[in-house]
Regions:
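Amphipathic alpha-helical binding modules
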Residues: 73-125
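Short terminal alpha-helical segments
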Residues: 1-46
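Residue-level recognition of alpha-helical coiled-coils
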Residues: 28, 52, 59, 66, ...
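Short, solvent-exposed, charged loop/turn and helix-capping segments
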Residues: 46-72
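Charged, low-complexity interaction regions
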Residues: 24-36, 57-62, 87-100
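Exposed, low-complexity/repetitive linear segments and helix-based recognition motifs
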Residues: 3, 21, 34-36, 65, ...
């Protein structure tokens, strides 16, 4: 059971890191804005799953509590869906705006060292 639980959490973390890597490697073309939207949605969904699973599985280590706090902070403070939709509707051809929103997404995930925490924990499973 514990191995399955840890494996499941590790898979969710790896999916978050994969989406983060995709966002990092976008080239700021108009089509990349659509990819950014998809990857941000994936990350948000996986963060919610990760947060809920950590709580439900009763893993109360300081590492998981710290991760949960970082996820809650991110979810409460960052939502790029409105901005991305606005850009898709009006400025999707402006590569500078695409780059700026991509940089904002990356910065938000690095703030409070959320991605670093996920990376470290996924390597320790």
């Amino acid at each position: 059971m514990i191995k399955d639980r840890d494996e499941y959490l590790n898979n969710v973390m790896k999916k978050i890191l994969n989406s983060y890597s995709i966002i990092e490697n976008l080239s700021d073309r108009p089509i990349d804005l659509e990819l950014l939207e998809v990857e941000v949605r994936k990350i948000n969904g996986f963060l919610l799953v990760l947060s809920k699973k950590v709580i439900l599985l009763g893993n109360n280590s300081s590492n998981t509590k710290n991760l949960e706090k970082k996820i809650i902070f991110y979810m409460q403070n960052y939502d790029f869906s409105r901005e991305i939709n606005l850009l898709l509707d009006t400025y999707s051809e402006d590569s500078l705006r695409v780059r700026n929103i991509r940089d904002s997404v990356l910065k938000s995930l690095n703030e409070n060292k959320l991605i670093q925490k996920i990376h470290d924990m996924s390597n320790n499973f």
